[in-house]
Design a protein with these regions (language model features):
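Generic helix-packing signal
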Residues: 16, 58, 103-106, 129
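Short Asp/Glu-rich motifs
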Residues: 33, 73, 91, 121-122, ...
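Short, electropositive alpha-helical surface patch
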Residues: 75-83, 123-131
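Short, cationic motifs built from Arg/Lys/His that form the positively charged side of catalytic pockets
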Residues: 83-85, 117
Length: 131
């Protein structure tokens, strides 16, 4: 997590060898109310602080919601995007996007969990998310 700060990030990077280190920004289950309560900041302010840290650090990439991708077009790091939902769901994910939308916004990798792991037909569910 980028919240661990620069020292933690650099320690992880120096111990990683050839392994890529990704910094998690804000969880896709958080919204404006959550970030205000947890950090005393607006969502955008907290996200900007974490991304600034990512830019200044040696992380190889970031993990962020698809909704924040549009603000990261100039970030030359790997972008891993959870919160992918091709259909409307009633779960804890608050900032979601379809797989096609996420790739169009600049995602390098997407993360799809429950829509696949809890599907009746896992193979069909996987096919649904392939772009």
């Amino acid at each position: 997590h980028l919240q661990g700060g620069a020292e933690m990030i650099e320690a992880a990077k120096s111990a990683a060898g050839n392994t890529k280190i990704l910094g998690v920004s804000l969880l896709t289950s958080l919204d404006e109310n959550d970030t205000s309560e947890l950090y005393g900041n607006s969502f955008d302010d907290q996200f900007t602080k974490l991304i600034t840290l990512a830019k200044l650090s040696s992380v190889d990439g970031i993990v962020c919601s698809p909704k924040e991708l549009i603000s990261l077009h100039d970030l030359n790091k790997i972008k891993v995007v959870p919160g992918i939902r091709n259909t409307q769901t009633n779960d804890d994910q608050k900032r979601t996007m379809t797989s096609q939308e996420a790739y169009a916004q600049g995602a390098d990798y997407i993360v799809v969990g429950r829509p696949i792991t809890q599907a009746n037909n896992i193979e069909a569910a996987i096919e649904e998310y392939l772009v």
